[in-house]
Amino acid sequence: MSKKAFFITGTDTDAGKTLVATGLLAAARLRGLSTLGLKPVAAGCTRTEQGLRNSDALALQAQSTLPVVYEQVNPVALEAAIAPHIAALQEKRSLSADRLAGFCRSSLRQADFTLVEGAGGWRVPLNPSETLANLAQLLRLPVVLVVGMRLGCINHALLTVEAIRNDGLPLVGWVANVLDADMPVLEENIASLAQRIPAPCLGVVPRLSMASADAASAHLDLTPLLDA
């Protein structure tokens, strides 16, 4: 099997990108594949004795079978839990898609199965002229969309799908991640998305009482990605 790499985006902040990404990495590991998860830029990092650390990036590192240091997983760590471009301005740092792509490129072909997780949604700014979509374009990665299932998600999902396709990247799969267990007509919403999104649904992750990569992996189908 050739090495596979994908860009993980979501309909919004807290859509469940990291839960799904770590679930997919766990599923790949169970198939005997080497894995690597990357989070090129992360805001909302905590100061530790080792430096700034982000919980999402640490989760991706934990599901990576390759022995990578934290800085390889998350090369740009920002402290404030706000939009990355604003956090960078506050820290007097600059973000660019080209620089972030450079961090990723050296790692993309190291593992059998690599995921690059964005921050927030598809159009999150990096600077006045670039967004995270530009990073995905530079890396030329097929995209997996995580849809946070709550009221309003159909519009968010379809607009994101449209943006991904307009940016010239293939959408190779999507995941319904249930954020609101009491969401009215949940199944009908998922069916509406499946009818309208031109990519396979990789699974429906329910609201988990104990959210973990292994628990999420039980609800995900890796086959469409390995066949992509």
Curated annotation (Swiss-Prot):
Keyword Metal-binding: yes
EC annotation from Swiss-Prot or TrEMBL: 6.3.3.3
Required cofactor(s): Mg(2+)
Residues where ATP binds: 14-19, 56, 117-120, 206-208
Binding site for Mg(2+): 18, 56, 117
GO annotations of cellular component type: cytosol
GO biological process: biotin biosynthetic process
Active site per database record: 39
Subcellular localization, as worded in the UniProt entry: Cytoplasm
Top-rank taxon: Bacteria
GO function terms (MF aspect): ATP binding; dethiobiotin synthase activity; magnesium ion binding
Keyword Lipid biosynthesis: no
Catalytic activity: (7R,8S)-7,8-diammoniononanoate + CO2 + ATP = (4R,5S)-dethiobiotin + ADP + phosphate + 3 H(+)
Matching Gene3D superfamilies: P-loop containing nucleotide triphosphate hydrolases
Pathway note: Cofactor biosynthesis; biotin biosynthesis; biotin from 7,8-diaminononanoate: step 1/2
Keywords, ordered alphabetically: ATP-binding, Biotin biosynthesis, Cytoplasm, Ligase, Magnesium, Metal-binding, Nucleotide-binding
InterPro entries attached to this UniProt entry: DTB_synth_BioD, P-loop_NTPase
Pfam family, one: AAA_26
Role summary: Catalyzes a mechanistically unusual reaction, the ATP-dependent insertion of CO2 between the N7 and N8 nitrogen atoms of 7,8-diaminopelargonic acid (DAPA, also called 7,8-diammoniononanoate) to form a ureido ring.
Entry similarity comment: Belongs to the dethiobiotin synthetase family.
Subunit structure: Homodimer.
Protein name per Swiss-Prot or TrEMBL: ATP-dependent dethiobiotin synthetase BioD
Lineage: Bacteria, Pseudomonadati, Pseudomonadota, Gammaproteobacteria, Cellvibrionales
